Amino acid sequence: VRNTMDAKADIGIAYDGDTDRVLMCDGKGRIIDGDIMLWVIGRWLKSKGTLGSGVVATVMSNMVLEDLLAKEDIKVFRCGVGDRYVLDTMRKENSRLGGEQSGHLIALDYANTGDGLCSGLLFLRALSDLDEDISTLSDRFDRYPQVLKNLRIENKDRVLGSIKLKEAEENALNKLKGKG
């Protein structure tokens, strides 16, 4: 971020160690994460007629992604965290784009796994073709308050397999539907 701002560049691009994730920042140093990239690339793929049934996002993605894509008549399919869950849901729902807030994106027409270089290039192409200004994306992607918390569980399989937990989760999801 600092290098982008010091260089007075419009955009900064960063990859993780094995280059399967990409994050960016605009010239003001605001982070462009996977949620924003899914929003932009999803709209672009829809405009080209190659999106498929919608966009796959994990439960960690901010609800504003779902709301903004809904305004474009793009459905969001939610899945568990991890690229294997994203890919499984993409195949199940016939989606061509999916990913995580962390910048781990999969665009099946270009690669069958997360590829940060490919995702970064797709995002830049989408920005160009949609005539988007990267400096306005963060303002328009006005995130809802969100708390992400990891919990350590000793007997994960037993706890996650609990019928009471599944019922509580289903009840909570039904109450929150469309609200968070």
Task: Locate predicted features.
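N-terminal small/polar loop signature for handling phosphorylated ligands or for N-terminal nucleophile
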Residues: 1-25
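Generic structural signal for well-ordered alpha-helical scaffold segments
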Residues: 1, 5, 43-46, 173
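Short, ordered loop/turn segments at secondary-structure junctions
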Residues: 17, 28, 36-37, 60, ...
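Short glycine/threonine-rich catalytic loop with a Thr-x-Gly-x-Asp
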Residues: 15-17, 31-36, 111-114
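Phosphate-binding and adjacent anionic-ligand microenvironments
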Residues: 11, 47-180
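Structural motif
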Residues: 36-51
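Short Gly/Thr/Asp-enriched flexible loops that form oxyanion-binding sites at enzyme active sites
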Residues: 20-39, 65-66
